């Protein structure tokens, strides 16, 4: 958020669609070991807790950035909507003109009713690839990546929550929740949005993801509520429930009634989110979970940022933050080059950027990968005991939690 404020974009976002939260509850679904991330150790008990992080929708962020560009009135900025890059290739050395043989040349083509006709070709002094995991810019620059697929999918949805109990959920405090469900393939997380809404990110096996997406809204809601409240044995049973051969309403009732019955026979769970009571139509989707890291973020006249440079497991929610950190660092690198009369596309100018960001992103991605693997070790032996002990120890060491949160903030 600090970078968005610095560049003047935050004031263009709809702040009614941004939600701060003051703590994050993380616990093991098999041992119930728990850690609470907040700034209580650094604040007065008579004050509201400081913000841990801020959530907003991607659409709100994009609109805010476009609004900031429009408000700048900079005639040197051109935005081409409904336009695709059909190819990227090196330019040519003109005998009577500049040598552009090392400059990227982009061929553009309209994809629909564009507001203005884009140029057919653009020659770039510096081409920034912010074009995702399958980055064409990265392929053009012949930059290799290393990594692997997790054979897991992240199921996402926008949910509505019941009004929180003001005793269990104090006024002025919003909480994010994450429960590790090893037997189901990964953690489930609920991140707060304004007006009693939340974003779901449930990392699970490919089969479980397909099952969840096939459910009716009522059955899906029942499964999400179960994921934060039921013991693992009960949750695994509900994940295997078959569709009955009768009507869809019976199918919906079977999950709801199963959850109701099992909650009646389960000790009440503490520090769980409010009950989910709705799911936004069309919001349930999934995406494959992967780890990727480019061997470098730069080549002559090319720089990579965000998912084009690195993709990590979403369990720490750091994907966008890392990308924003890349953009902030690259901006400073370009500014330094301009101030010192350097060529912004020269590899020597860009080395400052890759030196600042590559190791940071590798460290955070590696930690997320290690935690994912640690919570997917089968059995109840020493590894499970070590996980629980580690959570409990860290929860009792405020300076360690503070260090982890500051690193997560970037």
Describe the function of each predicted region.
Residues 283-292:
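Short gly/ser/thr-rich secondary-structure transition/capping motifs
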Residues 16-140, 146-158:
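Conserved N-terminal helical subregion
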Residues 112-113, 117, 126-267, 280-284, ...:
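Conserved FAD-binding catalytic core of PHBH/FMO-like flavoproteins
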Residues 1-5:
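Conserved N-terminal glycine-rich FAD pyrophosphate-binding loop of Rossmann-like flavoproteins
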Residues 313-325:
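A conserved FAD-binding loop/helix module that cradles the flavin
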Residues 130, 306, 325:
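Active-site flanking residues adjacent to catalytic metal/cofactor-binding acidic residues
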Residues 295-315:
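Short FAD-binding loop at a beta-strand-to-alpha-helix junction that anchors the flavin cofactor
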Residues 332-410:
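C-terminal helical "tail/cap" subdomain of flavin- and related membrane-associated enzymes
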């Amino acid at each position: 958020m600090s970078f968005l404020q610095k560049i003047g974009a935050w004031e263009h976002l709809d702040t009614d669609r941004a939600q701060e939260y003051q703590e994050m509850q993380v616990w093991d679904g098999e041992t119930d070991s728990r850690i609470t991330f907040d700034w209580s150790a650094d604040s007065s008990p008579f004050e509201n807790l400081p913000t841990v992080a801020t959530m907003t929708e991607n659409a709100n962020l994009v609109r805010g950035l476009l609004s900031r560009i429009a408000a700048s009135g900079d005639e040197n900025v051109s935005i081409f909507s409904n336009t695709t890059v059909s190819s990227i290739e090196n330019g040519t050395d003109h005998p009577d003109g500049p040598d552009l043989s090392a400059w990227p040349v982009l061929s553009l083509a309209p994809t629909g009713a564009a507001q203005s006709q884009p140029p057919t070709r653009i020659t770039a002094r510096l081409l920034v690839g912010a074009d995702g995991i399958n980055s064409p810019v990265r392929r053009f620059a012949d930059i290799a990546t290393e990594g692997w697929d997790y054979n897991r999918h992240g199921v996402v949805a926008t949910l509505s929550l019941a009004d929180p109990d003001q005793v269990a959920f104090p006024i002025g405090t919003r909480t994010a929740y994450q429960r590790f469900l090893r037997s189901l393939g990964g953690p489930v997380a609920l991140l707060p949005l304004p007006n009693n809404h939340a974003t779901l990110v449930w990392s699970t096996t490919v089969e479980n993801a397909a099952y969840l997406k096939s459910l009716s809204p009522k059955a899906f809601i029942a499964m999400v509520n179960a994921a934060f409240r039921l013991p693992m044995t009960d949750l695994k049973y509900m994940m295997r429930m078959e569709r009955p051969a009768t009507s869809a309403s019976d199918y919906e009732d079977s999950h709801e009634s199963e959850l109701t019955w099992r909650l009646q026979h389960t000790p009440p769970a503490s520090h769980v989110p409010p009950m989910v009571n709705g799911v936004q139509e069309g919001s349930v989707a999934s995406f494959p979970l992967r780890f990727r890291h480019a061997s470098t973020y730069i080549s002559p006249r090319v720089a990579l940022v965000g998912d084009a440079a690195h993709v990590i497991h979403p369990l720490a929610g750091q994907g966008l933050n890392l990308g924003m950190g890349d953009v902030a660092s690259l901006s400073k690198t370009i500014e330094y080059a301009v101030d010192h009369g350097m060529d912004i596309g020269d590899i020597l100018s860009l080395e400052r950027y890759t030196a600042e960001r590559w190791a940071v992103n590798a460290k955070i991605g590696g930690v997320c990968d290690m935690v994912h693997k640690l919570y997917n070790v089968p059995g109840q032996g020493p590894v499970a005991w070590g996980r629980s002990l580690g959570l409990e120890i860290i929860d009792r060491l405020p300076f360690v939690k503070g260090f982890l949160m500051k690193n997560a903030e970037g």
